[in-house]
Design a protein with these regions (language model features):
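Residues at the starts of beta-strands that form the adenosine-phosphate
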Residues: 35, 55, 176-177
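Extended acidic/charged loop-beta regions that coordinate divalent cations
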Residues: 1-10, 43-96, 137-138
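Short secondary-structure boundary/capping segments
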Residues: 27-28, 48-49, 76-78, 141-143, ...
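Flexible active-site lid/hinge loop adjacent to a nucleotide/diphosphate
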Residues: 1-51, 186, 190
């Protein structure tokens, strides 16, 4: 599973095309019955046509797809910091899914998990229940409720894509909002510009 080609590792790999090349090199180690699952809404991943003679399984949000997807979502409805609901369309059929973690990026994570689960033979009910039971880990959209405030702990290994996604989650919260942003590493020559863009986005 490759979720996106972002800006991590630019320091060593120079460009997003370099990152794509490095990530897809792992396909050479795929077993004969292996499956590659990719985000069909990513402008780089959507260009991957075949892996060892097989078409990858793509997922995405309806209307944004840059290629034909096997699993897609639409009717995405946000419920603040409580999560979101969406309609998932799969080869097995359609299902309404509750994702208990806020942020559109987590719709993509749930779509990727759905693709994996289908490859492993899980039923639609099992997939739906599994997604509804998902929880976060420390440093990844982890909600910490304290007296009079909620902290959104999303500090693990930040990059421009994850930082903007975290700011999107913050924007859905009620009340006064304060964003505490740290450095983003491994961004190479574009480091200053990418930090500036995140600051402007905030």
């Amino acid at each position: 599973v490759i979720t996106n080609i972002g800006f991590c590792h630019l320091e060593n790999l120079k460009t997003r095309d370099g990152i794509l090349k490095a990530k897809t090199e792992s396909f050479a180690h795929l077993k004969p019955d292996g499956v590659v699952i990719l985000n069909g809404d990513d402008d780089k991943l959507s260009t991957v046509e075949q892996v060892a003679g097989r078409k990858p399984v793509f997922y995405g949000i309806k209307g944004r797809n840059l290629c034909e997807t096997s699993v897609c979502a639409d009717a995405v409805t946000e419920h603040g910091l409580e999560g979101m609901t969406a309609e998932f369309h799969t080869p097995q059929g359609d299902m309404e899914v509750f994702i208990p973690i806020p942020g559109e990026h987590n719709v993509y994570n749930a779509l990727a998990a759905t693709c994996v689960a289908e490859q492993l033979g899980l039923s639609m009910d099992e997939i739906k229940c599994g997604i509804a039971a998902a929880s976060t880990i420390s440093g990844r959209t982890n909600l910490i409720h304290t007296k009079g405030m909620t902290v959104i702990d999303d500090c693990y290994n930040a990059n421009p894509v994850s930082m903007k996604a975290s700011l999107d989650v913050l924007s859905k919260a009620g009340g006064r909002k304060i964003a505490v942003l740290g450095d983003m590493g491994e961004l190479g020559e574009d480091e200053k510009q990418l930090h500036y863009e995140v600051g402007t986005y905030a």
